[in-house]
Amino acid sequence: MKKKFLLFINLLALLFAWQVSHIKQVAADDKIKVVTTFYPVYEFTKAVTGDSADVSMLIKAGTEPHDFEPSTKNVATISDADMFVYMDDSMETWVKKVQKSINSDDLTVVKSTGDMLLMAGTAEEEEEGHEGHSHEYDPHVWLSPKRAVTLVENIRDAFVAKYPDKTETFKTNSAAYIEKLNDLDKKYSDALSNAKQKSFVTQHAAFEYLALDYGLNQIPITGVSAESEPSAKRLASLTKYVKKYDIKYIYFEENASSKVAATLADEAGVKTAVLNPLESLTTKEIKAGEDYFTVMKDNLKALRLTTDVKGKEIKAETDDTKTVQHGYFKDKDVTDRKLTDWSGTWQSVYPYLLDGTLDEVWEYKADASKGEETAQEVKDYYTTGYKTDVEKIIIDGKKNTVTFVQNGEEHKYIYKYVGYKILKYEKGNRGVRYLFEAKDDNADDFKYIQFSDHNISSTKAEHFHLFWGSTSQKAILKEMDNWPTYFPASKSGQEIAQDLVAH
């Protein structure tokens, strides 16, 4: 009897253990399966989902996110998920290709940047023996607490859209996290709004959004790394640069080796500090309590080593602004062009200004002015510049025809090229207008036209400004305030806005 009783007890224990295990398995199976790319996306996603999702990170610490290419196993992991969250196509350049290879109606792909407009990317050179990387657009938006808020909101909205029954959970979780981001944003604003030194020199050009949002200037340098000493030639030029602007710190993305730090200190007279681009955290660091907030607070502390000390205005080692695109060129380099350079169907950007599509562009330009202009003042300037009633232009360069669609009516004329004119502007830069004249004496307002597209030789235009009139080429050359602007008709308003920010 006693043996039967013990057997019964053991069976009950086994049944209970099975039930507990089964309940845990059901709970685990009920969780949303989420794959994220690298650390910031991982943390932002976990902050939104909380305990309702099983969130994993594809790109582990020690792997360079810029250079990562998914393996077959990685693709299978993504395919098996309910949600896949990444930062932006300019960061994870492989995502679109992977999307095409995955045949799953259950997987939802989330781009954290959503419809955010991004600044132009920069090519980053590494020390000898290391490859650099470049981006068409700068993806490092997560390094500005202000913009991180938008990333979290975009992730939240994507989860709410797919799992409306969990809306309250996602909104509550994200609200708590965004409150912390807003507090961090305030800390940055308070510490940097009255910075004594507005410029900081960095080896990793990842902090342009941070600089833009908090009134600073990021100055990237090349030919130095945290791991190896610069060449004698680079060290000599760096020493000269450091002394010229009395630079106290050069920032690296990781702690410089003691040898590199000693060389820079002894030879160039400059110290090293870390600005962490937050592209990865190790499991050990995460378990130790490191996260977005601890790293960004450390970054602020490091920045203040420079911003709290009054000094000379630091400028870049080389001036890369004096390019043809910015209006700096030699007369001998200017050549004639044919109408074929502007062939295509083009749309005016003016309607997008009127409907608000370009509003974020004005915000960017106002921030870039460092307080000299408000977004409304920038918009007013472009309103005058873009204003036109010619909504579309169709150019057939082979036939030398231009069709103007004005208030819905078409006006088509044949043109001949009559040369170019170099103009000098108040800022000291210059521009070239390419002049054409209609063969039809009844072309009226479109008798004389002038193209300007920031190019000085035969090049297929990506966009252009067009000037026109009925009096003379000389009279039109005087127009400097109104420059109707045209982009390919195939582009959306969002794409045009992105081009204008990066332009």
Language-model-detected regions and their locations in the chain:
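Calycin-type beta-barrel ligand-binding domains and close structural analogs
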Residues: 319-332, 396-503
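Extracytoplasmic metal-acquisition and chelation regions
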Residues: 5-10, 17-327, 333, 345, ...
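Short, solvent-exposed loop/hinge segments that bridge or flank secondary-structure elements
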Residues: 328-331, 336-339, 347-399, 439-457
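A mature extracytoplasmic/lumenal domain signature
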Residues: 59, 90-91, 113-116, 147, ...
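Residues that flank catalytic or metal-binding motifs in active/ligand-binding sites
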Residues: 30, 196, 342, 389, ...
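Residues at beta-strand starts and edge strands
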Residues: 53, 340, 430-432
